[in-house]
Protein backbone atom coordinates (compact mmCIF):
# COMPACT_ATOMS: atom_id res chain seq x y z
CA UNK A 1 0.00 0.00 0.00
CA UNK A 2 1.29 3.44 -0.93
CA UNK A 3 -0.09 6.70 0.42
CA UNK A 4 -0.07 9.59 -2.06
CA UNK A 5 -0.54 13.29 -1.33
CA UNK A 6 -1.64 15.48 -4.22
CA UNK A 7 -1.14 19.24 -3.94
CA UNK A 8 -2.58 22.11 -5.97
CA UNK A 9 -0.37 25.05 -4.93
CA UNK A 10 -1.44 28.63 -4.51
CA UNK A 11 -0.94 31.58 -2.23
CA UNK A 12 -4.58 32.15 -1.30
CA UNK A 13 -5.62 28.48 -1.30
CA UNK A 14 -3.57 25.28 -1.38
CA UNK A 15 -5.65 22.21 -2.16
CA UNK A 16 -4.54 18.81 -0.88
CA UNK A 17 -5.81 15.25 -1.18
CA UNK A 18 -4.56 11.96 0.25
CA UNK A 19 -5.21 8.62 -1.47
CA UNK A 20 -4.10 5.07 -0.72
CA UNK A 21 -3.38 2.77 -3.66
CA UNK A 22 -2.03 -0.73 -4.06
CA UNK A 23 1.00 -1.72 -6.14
CA UNK A 24 -1.27 -2.11 -9.19
CA UNK A 25 -2.53 1.48 -8.98
CA UNK A 26 -5.95 0.54 -7.63
CA UNK A 27 -7.39 3.19 -5.34
CA UNK A 28 -7.97 1.54 -1.99
CA UNK A 29 -9.12 4.53 -0.02
CA UNK A 30 -9.80 8.24 -0.21
CA UNK A 31 -8.04 9.03 3.06
CA UNK A 32 -8.80 12.73 3.33
CA UNK A 33 -8.82 15.99 1.42
CA UNK A 34 -9.06 19.66 2.18
CA UNK A 35 -7.42 23.00 1.67
CA UNK A 36 -5.19 25.55 3.34
CA UNK A 37 -6.54 29.09 3.07
CA UNK A 38 -4.44 32.14 3.85
CA UNK A 39 -5.60 35.62 4.76
CA UNK A 40 -4.96 38.10 1.93
CA UNK A 41 -4.22 40.76 4.55
CA UNK A 42 -1.09 38.87 5.66
CA UNK A 43 2.35 39.60 4.23
CA UNK A 44 3.87 37.18 1.74
CA UNK A 45 6.17 35.74 4.40
CA UNK A 46 3.27 35.26 6.81
CA UNK A 47 1.19 33.53 4.13
CA UNK A 48 4.05 31.21 3.18
CA UNK A 49 4.62 30.43 6.86
CA UNK A 50 0.93 29.60 7.26
CA UNK A 51 1.09 27.29 4.23
CA UNK A 52 4.17 25.48 5.54
CA UNK A 53 2.79 25.17 9.09
CA UNK A 54 -0.48 23.69 7.84
CA UNK A 55 1.26 21.46 5.29
CA UNK A 56 3.49 20.05 8.03
CA UNK A 57 0.33 19.22 9.97
CA UNK A 58 -1.11 17.40 6.93
CA UNK A 59 2.18 15.50 6.47
CA UNK A 60 2.32 14.57 10.15
CA UNK A 61 -1.34 13.51 10.30
CA UNK A 62 -1.54 11.44 7.10
CA UNK A 63 2.11 10.38 6.61
CA UNK A 64 2.19 10.15 2.81
CA UNK A 65 5.07 8.32 1.16
CA UNK A 66 4.97 10.20 -2.13
CA UNK A 67 3.78 13.63 -3.22
CA UNK A 68 2.53 14.96 -6.54
CA UNK A 69 2.52 18.74 -7.05
CA UNK A 70 0.98 20.67 -9.92
CA UNK A 71 3.47 22.72 -11.93
CA UNK A 72 2.92 26.34 -12.83
CA UNK A 73 1.09 27.13 -16.01
CA UNK A 74 0.62 30.34 -17.90
CA UNK A 75 -0.82 33.26 -15.94
CA UNK A 76 -1.69 36.60 -17.51
CA UNK A 77 -0.73 38.40 -14.32
CA UNK A 78 3.02 38.32 -13.53
CA UNK A 79 2.33 39.04 -9.86
CA UNK A 80 0.18 35.89 -9.67
CA UNK A 81 2.96 33.79 -11.24
CA UNK A 82 5.47 35.06 -8.71
CA UNK A 83 3.25 34.45 -5.68
CA UNK A 84 2.26 30.93 -6.82
CA UNK A 85 5.93 30.16 -7.58
CA UNK A 86 6.82 31.24 -4.05
CA UNK A 87 4.13 28.97 -2.59
CA UNK A 88 5.30 26.08 -4.79
CA UNK A 89 8.86 26.61 -3.61
CA UNK A 90 7.81 26.50 0.03
CA UNK A 91 5.70 23.38 -0.61
CA UNK A 92 8.40 21.56 -2.59
CA UNK A 93 11.04 22.36 0.02
CA UNK A 94 8.80 21.25 2.90
CA UNK A 95 8.01 17.91 1.26
CA UNK A 96 11.54 17.24 0.01
CA UNK A 97 13.20 18.16 3.31
CA UNK A 98 10.75 15.78 4.99
CA UNK A 99 12.28 12.94 2.98
CA UNK A 100 9.36 12.49 0.61
CA UNK A 101 9.54 11.55 -3.05
CA UNK A 102 8.14 14.53 -4.95
CA UNK A 103 6.94 14.52 -8.56
CA UNK A 104 5.65 17.49 -10.54
CA UNK A 105 2.96 17.43 -13.21
CA UNK A 106 1.74 20.00 -15.70
CA UNK A 107 -1.99 20.74 -15.94
CA UNK A 108 -1.91 19.07 -19.38
CA UNK A 109 -0.44 15.87 -17.92
CA UNK A 110 -3.01 15.85 -15.12
CA UNK A 111 -5.93 16.31 -17.51
CA UNK A 112 -4.56 13.71 -19.94
CA UNK A 113 -4.05 11.21 -17.13
CA UNK A 114 -7.55 11.57 -15.75
CA UNK A 115 -9.74 12.17 -18.81
CA UNK A 116 -7.58 11.03 -21.72
CA UNK A 117 -7.80 14.56 -23.10
CA UNK A 118 -5.24 17.22 -22.20
CA UNK A 119 -7.63 20.09 -22.84
CA UNK A 120 -10.48 18.88 -20.60
CA UNK A 121 -12.36 21.69 -18.91
CA UNK A 122 -12.79 22.15 -15.17
CA UNK A 123 -16.27 20.58 -15.14
CA UNK A 124 -15.10 17.45 -17.00
CA UNK A 125 -12.22 17.09 -14.56
CA UNK A 126 -14.42 17.48 -11.52
CA UNK A 127 -16.95 14.92 -12.75
CA UNK A 128 -14.13 12.47 -13.46
CA UNK A 129 -12.70 12.96 -9.96
CA UNK A 130 -16.14 12.39 -8.46
CA UNK A 131 -16.65 9.26 -10.58
CA UNK A 132 -13.20 7.67 -10.19
CA UNK A 133 -13.10 8.24 -6.43
CA UNK A 134 -16.78 7.34 -5.97
CA UNK A 135 -17.55 10.59 -4.15
CA UNK A 136 -21.08 11.85 -3.58
CA UNK A 137 -20.12 15.42 -4.46
CA UNK A 138 -17.30 17.26 -6.18
CA UNK A 139 -14.90 18.45 -3.46
CA UNK A 140 -14.89 22.20 -2.87
CA UNK A 141 -13.16 24.55 -3.29
CA UNK A 142 -11.92 23.70 -6.79
CA UNK A 143 -8.34 23.61 -5.49
CA UNK A 144 -9.22 20.55 -3.40
CA UNK A 145 -10.64 18.71 -6.40
CA UNK A 146 -7.56 19.73 -8.38
CA UNK A 147 -5.30 18.28 -5.67
CA UNK A 148 -7.13 14.95 -5.87
CA UNK A 149 -6.59 15.04 -9.64
CA UNK A 150 -2.86 15.54 -9.03
CA UNK A 151 -2.83 12.53 -6.69
CA UNK A 152 -4.63 10.41 -9.31
CA UNK A 153 -2.17 11.56 -11.97
CA UNK A 154 0.72 10.56 -9.72
CA UNK A 155 -0.78 7.11 -9.17
CA UNK A 156 -1.19 6.64 -12.94
CA UNK A 157 2.32 7.94 -13.58
CA UNK A 158 3.96 5.62 -11.05
CA UNK A 159 2.03 2.65 -12.51
CA UNK A 160 3.15 3.57 -16.04
CA UNK A 161 6.76 3.95 -14.87
CA UNK A 162 6.59 0.58 -13.12
CA UNK A 163 5.31 -1.09 -16.32
CA UNK A 164 8.10 0.45 -18.39
CA UNK A 165 10.77 -0.64 -15.91
CA UNK A 166 9.53 -4.26 -15.81
Where are these regions (language model features)?
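Phosphate- and other anionic-substrate recognition elements at nucleic-acid/protein interfaces
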Residues: 1-166
